[in-house]
């Protein structure tokens, strides 16, 4: 086999690989010999079919298999011989007349085109300084959590006859929504439950029901926001005919042992302990998130190297498609943004470059330090995922068994976390005690006002390139995506009430 490098421009590589016809012929002969004892042909005893007859009958078909196998084997050998690490599976283009190769009259010649993983030096992580935010779980924090827990457990009791509804009360209502006097699709419901002040219905709806009594029939006038999710309702005035069937007031929930028993605990003391431990776990996760974010920022700052264009383009397309998909839920396109689409694309391309750079960095750290994901870790992650789908565990396991990409997406965040932990062990990490609010604050909050389009890329994205780089760098910035819609209000039977739901909220501007 002869390998010639025909292009080495930047990270782009082209190799010309030539395999002598004699080598193909030898492989063909070996395969035909194997077939001799397996093929059953009329007129010949088992194992007595002449190779010449097999060549005449099956020669081209078998030679096709030989060529396919040889291309795969020789392309991998060429990469090893040249010490090249492709970013993606190389594209293969056969050269010359394939018929001549099949007939054994010409060598097998093909061209390999690909981009290589860049070579770069990793920083000395022992010289990297990072700050880790920490906060103490205080008694008053547990008190707040207890009150919130009690609030979620509250029951409602009917108000006295003739009593007026107040904010926080639970109403049972029938309503019919109309625009220009005509009822519209999805604008009606019977026996709908509405907690005044919950914000589940469009702005202005709930406030107008303060003061109503059982038996009242009233009209609620609202204006659907211009950016409302349902295009046929956006920007229009509507009137809802509302009949009040029941008014209930929230009953006081006492912070006592009885409340604890609702959660399977014997006393309020045990409930406080359980809440405290749960909150410590939440604080630790937030602390780690801030550390990881700071680490990724520092890694991005310390390393600069050429990136494979195809990897960046693929990452950009993934980000942009997600962005357009989320815009479509608001009946918008990129043309509706306050910024020129070209500027938004440029900003997202920088995000794509950052993601690819960090992915290559983390993969390099993992490879050089033999960091791997064990079967036990993978099985544990799979079990945790299965617990999210009670009753469907077997289907989930089958899905992962049959989909290697799904397993890869499960492995990626585990690999990344192990690499992050490895770097954190080497780096100079200084703890900084902050308040709970500071710990849970959005790290991008100060920058939100400087952007004029509502978009926020989820930081969690699992993807794996053909070179085996597992990464999802879950806390990288900037975070951008279209504002998510508010969930539809639900009636007791779970049926959505689109007309009465709150419109998509304008999200704070992000990064």
Swiss-Prot record:
<protein>
    <recommendedName>
        <fullName>Trigger factor</fullName>
        <ecNumber>5.2.1.8</ecNumber>
    </recommendedName>
</protein>
<keyword id="KW-0131">Cell cycle</keyword>
<dbReference type="GO" id="GO:0043022">
    <property type="term" value="F:ribosome binding"/>
</dbReference>
<keyword id="KW-0143">Chaperone</keyword>
<keyword id="KW-0697">Rotamase</keyword>
<dbReference type="GO" id="GO:0061077">
    <property type="term" value="P:chaperone-mediated protein folding"/>
</dbReference>
<keyword id="KW-0963">Cytoplasm</keyword>
<dbReference type="InterPro" id="IPR027304">
    <property type="entry name" value="Trigger_fact/SurA_dom_sf"/>
</dbReference>
<dbReference type="GO" id="GO:0005737">
    <property type="term" value="C:cytoplasm"/>
</dbReference>
<comment type="function">
    <text>Involved in protein export. Acts as a chaperone by maintaining the newly synthesized protein in an open conformation. Functions as a peptidyl-prolyl cis-trans isomerase.</text>
</comment>
<feature type="domain" description="PPIase FKBP-type">
    <location>
        <begin position="168"/>
        <end position="253"/>
    </location>
</feature>
<dbReference type="Pfam" id="PF05698">
    <property type="entry name" value="Trigger_C"/>
</dbReference>
<feature type="compositionally biased region" description="Basic residues">
    <location>
        <begin position="479"/>
        <end position="488"/>
    </location>
</feature>
<feature type="region of interest" description="Disordered">
    <location>
        <begin position="446"/>
        <end position="511"/>
    </location>
</feature>
<dbReference type="GO" id="GO:0051083">
    <property type="term" value="P:'de novo' cotranslational protein folding"/>
</dbReference>
<dbReference type="Pfam" id="PF05697">
    <property type="entry name" value="Trigger_N"/>
</dbReference>
<dbReference type="GO" id="GO:0043335">
    <property type="term" value="P:protein unfolding"/>
</dbReference>
<dbReference type="InterPro" id="IPR008881">
    <property type="entry name" value="Trigger_fac_ribosome-bd_bac"/>
</dbReference>
<feature type="compositionally biased region" description="Basic residues">
    <location>
        <begin position="499"/>
        <end position="511"/>
    </location>
</feature>
<dbReference type="InterPro" id="IPR008880">
    <property type="entry name" value="Trigger_fac_C"/>
</dbReference>
<dbReference type="InterPro" id="IPR046357">
    <property type="entry name" value="PPIase_dom_sf"/>
</dbReference>
<comment type="similarity">
    <text>Belongs to the FKBP-type PPIase family. Tig subfamily.</text>
</comment>
<feature type="compositionally biased region" description="Basic and acidic residues">
    <location>
        <begin position="455"/>
        <end position="478"/>
    </location>
</feature>
<dbReference type="InterPro" id="IPR036611">
    <property type="entry name" value="Trigger_fac_ribosome-bd_sf"/>
</dbReference>
<keyword id="KW-0132">Cell division</keyword>
<dbReference type="InterPro" id="IPR001179">
    <property type="entry name" value="PPIase_FKBP_dom"/>
</dbReference>
<dbReference type="GO" id="GO:0051301">
    <property type="term" value="P:cell division"/>
</dbReference>
<dbReference type="InterPro" id="IPR037041">
    <property type="entry name" value="Trigger_fac_C_sf"/>
</dbReference>
<dbReference type="InterPro" id="IPR005215">
    <property type="entry name" value="Trig_fac"/>
</dbReference>
<dbReference type="GO" id="GO:0015031">
    <property type="term" value="P:protein transport"/>
</dbReference>
<dbReference type="GO" id="GO:0003755">
    <property type="term" value="F:peptidyl-prolyl cis-trans isomerase activity"/>
</dbReference>
<dbReference type="GO" id="GO:0044183">
    <property type="term" value="F:protein folding chaperone"/>
</dbReference>
<feature type="compositionally biased region" description="Basic and acidic residues">
    <location>
        <begin position="489"/>
        <end position="498"/>
    </location>
</feature>
<keyword id="KW-0413">Isomerase</keyword>
<dbReference type="Pfam" id="PF00254">
    <property type="entry name" value="FKBP_C"/>
</dbReference>
